[in-house]
């Protein structure tokens, strides 16, 4: 274990940028193993993906960090601080967070697959943040690997030198030495003054039931010592620092972090919002003048209502959301009340995958059963009196005669797709009301840029893009502007009563089709009662689709055989009146599957 007071010129902070399945987690496993971070016995697959969900889906969701010591060929020992990054488009915010703590990034590209759109987006983020990007070609042991072709593709599409890109195979361990040497040689050491007042950037925070809030920090200037008092700059709160150390990948307490190092701080913060991600820690006695320029605050793009199935879970649901939002700064939530579903929260997410992951984490880690309403994006509504309101819930859309114009959010989507699937992708984009703005050919790949309504992208665009291109197309998108659109609210009425949780905002062209699909689906899901149930889809007072769940009837004429017809008529008339009375008094139970049906509309 080298001496802790490490030369600043021998510290290297880096991240790995890669698309899902290009071997980022495996490469990080190899680096840890090579530098002796873990024994062979402890080497679980995907060491840094510590969440079960991450291992199951094979994706990285949270940022993690590990400190390794590597003795290079020049005889010097280097401290490598590696901050893991997620690759999925929904977690791009986590990526910019991880990159804010680094001076360099390894751009890992699968030598058999080539460059993908998300890798490209994350790579541009790294270049904007002035990081040194080192291209690495992985999976070089595969028979279909084409190192030269992919290196050329990196130069064409990304625009960085890749002729002498490092070639390695994370699976077999081939070329790992070259990767480490390249990190030491190409990535610059951290800048920063040990003598200046302390500035430490919080890259991530999570809640530990025994120790309170644990923060992962990168020290920009000064030194962080256990026992001293620190101040969180945005809140002005001060805390006593209890423990300081780094991960190798297990926590290793050292009591001090020097300039340029990455490690963890525990200071007994019990309040979940005590150490927000992206904030700066400084010394209480000699505070820094200004915080470290953090990274962009991210706005939720998709909103959905979440309601616990049993109302007793409401309190624990609120606590669980609080703990998750500490660790996931992009999650937004506020209380909401629905006539159909009771008390719950309106939550904001970065995208559909983010929403699924949060829902699954709530159900798994906190054991809460939830119903989620249909996701919507944020619309801007200009009212007739000239005021503009933002609407993220169909229920809050003003009355039709109060609306002047509805503006919907448009995203710029960059899609990379092999040439043979280009036709399918264009058809899909046109179907989703997209407008093509650019197209460029790079070798076998085509890069197309579309302006698409965010509402269409949110619903099921990602899944359909993957299925029309056999999984080869990749997508990256960012918000561009608001644009006027002919949007309407479709309400679902059951026996004349509006069900608020089933309302949706959609384009007028699609309203009838979606209304019809939803009504038909509801008819299958609502159980038959002793009276007819009318299910209607309406826009304002105009009914656009209707369907009826037929009543259950007893055969009242069974006991009459032969005899007078008027006897039968009398019995049927009596039954009819009874049903009518029932219909006025009866209320319809809507099963939970019916609320989930809304999510499937449009598929």
UniProtKB/Swiss-Prot annotation:
Residues 9-191 form the tr-type G domain. GTP binds at residues 21-26, 138-141. It holds the Pfam family LepA_C. It is a peripheral membrane protein. It is an enzyme of class 3 (hydrolase). Keywords: Cell inner membrane, Cell membrane, GTP-binding, Hydrolase, Membrane, Nucleotide-binding, Protein biosynthesis. GO terms for biological process: positive regulation of translation. It catalyses: GTP + H2O = GDP + phosphate + H(+). GO terms for cellular component: plasma membrane. Its EC number is 3.6.5.n1. It comes from the Bacteria. GO terms for molecular function: GTP binding; GTPase activity; guanosine tetraphosphate binding; ribosome binding; translation elongation factor activity. Its main location: membrane. It is found in: Cell inner membrane. Required for accurate and efficient protein synthesis under certain stress conditions. May act as a fidelity factor of the translation reaction, by catalyzing a one-codon backward translocation of tRNAs on improperly translocated ribosomes. Back-translocation proceeds from a post-translocation (POST) complex to a pre-translocation (PRE) complex, thus giving elongation factor G a second chance to translocate the tRNAs correctly. Binds to ribosomes in a GTP-dependent manner. PANTHER family: TRANSLATION FACTOR GUF1 HOMOLOG, CHLOROPLASTIC, TRANSLATION FACTOR GUF1-RELATED. Belongs to the TRAFAC class translation factor GTPase superfamily. Classic translation factor GTPase family. LepA subfamily. This is Elongation factor 4. It comes from Idiomarina loihiensis (strain ATCC BAA-735 / DSM 15497 / L2-TR). The lineage of its organism: Bacteria, Pseudomonadati, Pseudomonadota, Gammaproteobacteria, Alteromonadales. The gene is lepA.
